[in-house]
Amino acid sequence: MEEEERPRKIQKLGSSEAHESEPLITGAIKGSQDDTSPAEQTNSQKAIPGATTDNSKESEEPASSTATDGPETTEQKISKRQLRRQAKLEQWEAKREERKIIRKQKTAARKERRRELWEEAKREGKDPNEELNKLFPMTTRTRHRKSTRLPLTLIIDCGFDDLMQDKERVSLGQQLTRSYSENNKSAFNGHLIISSFNKKLKERFETVLHKTHEGWKGVRFTGEDWLQAAKEASEVMQGPNGGKLVGPFEDKTDAKPEDGEIVYLTSDSSETLTELKPYSTYIIGGLVDKNRHKGICHKRATELGIRTAKLPIGQYIQMNSRPVLATNHVVEIMVRWLQLRDWAEAFMQTLPPRKGGALKDSVKGQRDSTPRDDVESNTEKGTVSETVEDTEATEPAEAVTPKDIDAVQENKQDE
């Protein structure tokens, strides 16, 4: 093609030269427009001022909307309340080191104050201990420097991580901490296992809580489910560090490891737990759901043929609400029973005031007129049967021993 036959170069849109010069045209040679492809025609139309088509507008609009949809969608997902909460958490974390310094300063100031009072009491001829107790009264809580481990295992099943919200997961973490504390400081305690410890719950303990759980003594965390944890617990209880048959088990010295059983505790069970047995494993559901998933623990156990039972709250306590307890309350009640062997007293020392728990009148009369050892036998005869649901009509489920776990796991895998 010769120089004079070539079309003029099309100038870019928006340039000042394009507006000052004469209108530009394409196809200086006849028939050139017909020879061009549709794509080239479209491109050439976009390059001509005022020649933009509807298709070009449609292609530009989604691009602009895509660029603006991202931030709007993000803002819709995060509410103002969540933003404020996140800001508070960031502020709390930022001042962590500052709080440590303040605590150390307060501790040092308190020690210095006690030392000054001690010296002052000695100069005045007074008893320093009495003077210090007046200003710094000792706590009345009983502390046991050394606990006695019993051949009994408590497993907290945390396999409900996907069913909980973030705030419920935070609450469960607090309940696990309190459960460990109650079991650890008790005069008689059992083996404590946290099963299905994974996903977001584990992430919270390792990040927000700075792995403080790794320093807990007498507790084991495992990613396995509660059924596998129960099998391993049976082997541990038979070992040299399995525990001693003392305290509440001192009259069961003839108990054998094969007599132990596995029980999943749930308020939906028709069977009531009467006592804790040596070499047995009790599973507690680690779920905080505000009763959204009712009966899920009971269903989980019955599908595998595991025995279920509920604490005897209805026999001793008059409740103002549904007898569903937090995980740490269940652990505390069982630990207190190991010390007292008295369900009524264990409930009264553990239940929070908001539950409105009070001893039933029939139980009060029993405790006043009947020796502590005979309370259980009188209860079975029907002394308090009028105020509790009839559980004798339901035949207790056959106990599952640790030997049966392999068969249960095989059936679970086959399904």
Curated annotation (Swiss-Prot):
Stretch list, region Disordered: 1-84, 354-415
A GO term for molecular function: tRNA binding
Feature: compositional bias, Basic and acidic residues: 361-379, 401-415
Annotated SAM-dependent MTase TRM10-type domain residues: 140-358
Biased composition (Polar residues): 34-46, 62-73
GO term, biological process aspect, one: tRNA N1-guanine methylation
Keywords: Cytoplasm, Methyltransferase, Nucleus, S-adenosyl-L-methionine, Transferase, tRNA processing
Pfam families: tRNA_m1G_MT
Catalytic activity, EC: 2.1.1.221
UniProt xrefs under CDD domains: SPOUT_Trm10-like
Catalytic site: 289 (proton acceptor)
Residues noted as binding S-adenosyl-L-methionine in the record, renumbered to the chain: 265-266, 285, 289-293, 297, 311, 323-325
Subcellular location: Cytoplasm; Nucleus
tRNA processing keyword on record: yes
Catalytic activity from the UniProt record: guanosine(9) in tRNA + S-adenosyl-L-methionine = N(1)-methylguanosine(9) in tRNA + S-adenosyl-L-homocysteine + H(+)
Function per UniProt: S-adenosyl-L-methionine-dependent guanine N(1)-methyltransferase that catalyzes the formation of N(1)-methylguanine at position 9 (m1G9) in cytoplasmic tRNA.
Family: Belongs to the class IV-like SAM-binding methyltransferase superfamily. TRM10 family.
Subunit structure: Monomer.
Protein name (Swiss-Prot/TrEMBL): tRNA (guanine(9)-N1)-methyltransferase
